[in-house]
């Protein structure tokens, strides 16, 4: 199994690269994000206050009025993500990803895992330790 991490600045095209690779490669691909579990967690926190579709880029720009005038969904994602990393373990989200990758490997039907939101050194290290490679997208 091939693991390809994709890094780059915000809106540099990381997901676009993953989508093209998945679409035009002959490999059976799946795309995972380190932020998937974080978004699920934050979505659950926000359910009582309305519907926030975390899969949409525009959602990150929405303000959460009861959290303060300028507090956005992006701020919530950053704060919650960092809180888990700082309070529990720096590898909190990495460990979740390792579990997801192990489940996919066990299933055996996927050739390539694409991870288009590699940001932190421990995320790079995890991919390298699992025999993968990391691509950098420049715009």
Q: Where are the regions a protein language model picked out?
A:
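ATP-binding Walker
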Residues: 11-12
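Post-Walker A helix-loop "phosphate-sensing" segment adjacent to the P-loop in P-loop NTPases
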Residues: 22-31
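The Walker A (P-loop) glycine that initiates the GxxxxGKT/S ATP-binding motif of P-loop NTPases
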Residues: 8
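ATP-dependent NMP and nucleoside kinases share a basic, alpha-helical "lid"
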Residues: 28, 96-139
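ATP-dependent small-molecule kinase phosphotransfer cores
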Residues: 36-110
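Extreme N-terminal starter segment of soluble prokaryotic enzymes
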Residues: 1-4
């Amino acid at each position: 199994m091939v693991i390809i991490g994709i890094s780059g600045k915000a809106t540099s095209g990381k997901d676009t690269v993953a989508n093209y690779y998945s679409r035009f490669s002959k490999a059976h691909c799946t795309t995972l994000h380190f932020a998937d579990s974080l978004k699920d967690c934050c979505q659950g926190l926000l359910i009582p206050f309305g519907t926030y579709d975390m899969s949409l880029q525009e959602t990150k720009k929405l303000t959460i009025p009861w959290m303060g005038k300028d507090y956005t969904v992006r701020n919530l994602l950053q704060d919650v993500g960092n809180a888990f990393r700082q309070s529990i373990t720096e590898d909190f989200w990495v460990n979740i990803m390792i579990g997801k990758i192990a489940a996919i490997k066990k299933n055996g039907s996927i050739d390539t895992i694409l991870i288009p939101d590699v940001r932190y050194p421990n995320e790079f290290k995890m991919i390298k330790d699992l025999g993968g490679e990391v691509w950098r997208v420049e715009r």
